Each structure stands twice: as C-alpha cells, then as structure tokens.
Design a protein with these regions (language model features):
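Residues that scaffold, gate, or flank divalent-cation-dependent active/transport sites
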Residues: 17
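Structural beta-sheet core signal
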Residues: 14, 48-50, 97, 115
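An active-site-proximal "capping" alpha-helix that borders the catalytic cofactor pocket
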Residues: 28-50
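Catalytic P-loop NTPase motifs of RecA-like helicase/translocase cores
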Residues: 21-23, 104-105
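Von Willebrand factor
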Residues: 47, 55-60, 64-104, 120-130
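Acidic, polar low-complexity linker/tail segments
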Residues: 1-13, 22-25
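VWA/integrin I-like adhesion module and closely mimicked acidic/polar interface patches used
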Residues: 29, 102-146
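Residues at the starts of beta-strands that form the adenosine-phosphate
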Residues: 11, 45-47, 94, 112
C-alpha cells in the first residue's frame, strides 16, 4: 500500500466557477485540472463545489475515489460569498478556486487560498488584468488555454 506523506493535506476544497462568463471549454478544462490536482496532492478528503451565485453542486471525495460523474453546466451570475460561507463551515486547510475573476473578491479568509485563472493573453475580456489586480491574497496561477 501507498504510504501517506507526513505533511499531507487532510481536506482540500476545490471550487469551480460555472457562471455565465465561463465558456464550456474553460469549465471542462477546470474540471480536468481538478482531477490532476487530486491525483498529485491526494488529500484524504477533497470537497468539489460548482458555483455561480450559489453552490450548484457539492460532493466530498475520499482519497480512493476519482472525480467522475461531475456534470458541468455553466450559466448565471457570479458570487463567491456562498462558497466562502460554506468553506468556513468545512474549515479545510486550503481552498482552490478556478474562476475568470469576473466576481467581487471577498475579504481575506483564514484558510489558504489558491486561484487558477484563464491565460490573460488568450482571454477576450479587456479587463482581465484589472481582475487579476483585485486578488490581494493567496497565490494566483494561470491555466494555459491549450
């Protein structure tokens, strides 16, 4: 059997933006990235949330489960506050957010936050750099388009 790492994550929350500004391609790309993240980090628990103005889907996956049968339907507005409210209840070690940042960023939380955003060079929104500057906490990573 595989041995766990000493500093292994016990609970990671992965929040995928499925609002109307997210393209179908981006949503699928974000989901593929979630699968890769789970394989690499292998937390004991990984809560996956799909959200727009509310949490549309939430499921906890154990370390021996794969992220399968998650259907993504993008549409609607964008509000991160319901995600932050729920994450506050869960109290994980980290929150990973995949979003295009077309959202008001809540105040800095107590948990570690990691942002994954589309490549601004490929993104059609002229305000993308402004959105990136709105993120004042956590680490921001760019997801290449291809």
């Amino acid at each position: 059997p595989k041995r766990g790492r000493k500093n292994r994550l016990t609970h990671l929350v992965y929040a995928l933006d499925v609002s109307g500004s997210i393209t179908s391609y981006q949503a699928q790309q974000f989901l593929r990235s979630a699968k890769t993240l789970k394989e690499k980090l292998n937390p004991k628990l990984m809560t996956v949330m799909l959200w727009d103005t509310r949490i549309q889907f939430e499921k906890v996956f154990r370390e021996d489960e794969t992220l399968d049968n998650i259907k993504v339907n993008a549409g609607g507005g964008t509000n991160l506050q319901p995600v932050y409210n729920r994450v506050r209840q869960i109290n994980p070690e980290a929150l990973v957010i995949f979003t295009d940042l077309c959202v008001d960023i809540p105040p800095k939380p107590t948990w570690e936050t990691i942002w994954f955003v589309p490549d601004p060079n490929m993104y059609k929104d002229q305000y993308m750099n402004q959105y990136l500057q709105a993120v004042t906490y956590g680490d921001v990573y760019v997801v290449p388009e291809k």
